[in-house]
Amino acid sequence: MSIFAGKTLMITGGTGSFGNAVLNRFLRTDIGEIRIFSRDEKKQDDMRHEYQAKYPDVANKIKFFIGDVRNLQSCRNAMPGVDYIFHAAALKQVPSCEFFPMEAVKTNVIGTDNVLTAAIEAGVGAVICLSTDKAAYPINAMGITKAVEEKIAVAKSRYSGKTKICCTRYGNVMCSRGSVIPLWIEQIRNGNPVTLTEPKMTRFIMSLEEAVDLVLFAFEHGQNGDILVQKAPACTIQTQAEAVCELFGGKKEDIKVIGIRHGEKMYETLLTNEECAKAEDMGNFYRVPVSYTHLTLPTNSR
């Protein structure tokens, strides 16, 4: 972790599953400060007490900033002294975004623009934006807004000065807040049917640890404007549900199909065909480089 030695890292949306995974990975390293930026004071207070109990000797490295990525001045207020940013703040529930698409625009699109604008103004060293495989050939409001988030990050990278901007694109992060596996576990423990939307639906899956690994890979190896994607395995929703039943004592015959929810795709895609054509294979990851060709190209090539 020497690259983070004595540095200040800010995590937007930092009270979520990703922020917790980063704290557990970094707190006992030589990092200087981890700044949690989010709008929910109750979650911040819960996190403060949790980490004071869990890591009493290093919990003072965590600093909490109440603010909203939707507000540019709020982002600016949190920036002084920040060296790096992991931008995780997002609306990510597909059905909710379908019903309230402008709320998704405000957080995922305008919020990203605000974070990047404030970061560039403050001379932050690097910003890693967390995206989703739903941004590849998007069909729902969440995916569309995350696709625009990626476009904003790429566009900002062209004029970002000393600030490196990269995106990471995820599949489904298992056991993250709002994901289906915690719901299934709760259903099994309560003796209720295990509900799934469509047995043949496929999803790319990764762990929270892998989510942090991907961001660190982008931080260390990504170039300005890159999109970094992990080569995640895929499986059907039926297979996932049966595995959870086996692990937590549920019965496969109790699985109940409830139908596809608003905005959901049958099959996700990690990369578009166009991205595949230019992607660089980096072992466990793909790197999709940005094109810095200017809009004002000559009309002839004499």
Annotate each predicted stretch with a short phrase:
Residues 12-25:
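N-terminal Rossmann NAD(P)H-binding glycine-rich loop of SDR-like oxidoreductase domains
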Residues 31-43:
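Conserved glycine-rich Rossmann-like NAD(P)H-binding loop of the short-chain dehydrogenase/reductase
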Residues 38, 66, 106:
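Conserved residues in the N-terminal Rossmann fold of short-chain dehydrogenase/reductase
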Residues 63-84:
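Conserved Rossmann-fold cofactor-binding substructure of NAD(P)-dependent oxidoreductases
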Residues 84-87, 91-151, 155:
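Conserved Rossmann-fold NAD(P)-dependent oxidoreductase catalytic core, especially the SDR/UDP-sugar
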Residues 141-222, 233, 237, 241-248:
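NAD(P)-dependent short-chain dehydrogenase/reductase
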Residues 221-291:
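Mid/C-terminal beta-alpha module of Rossmann-like enzyme folds, strongest
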Residues 293-299:
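Conserved small/polar residues in nucleotide/adenosyl-binding loops
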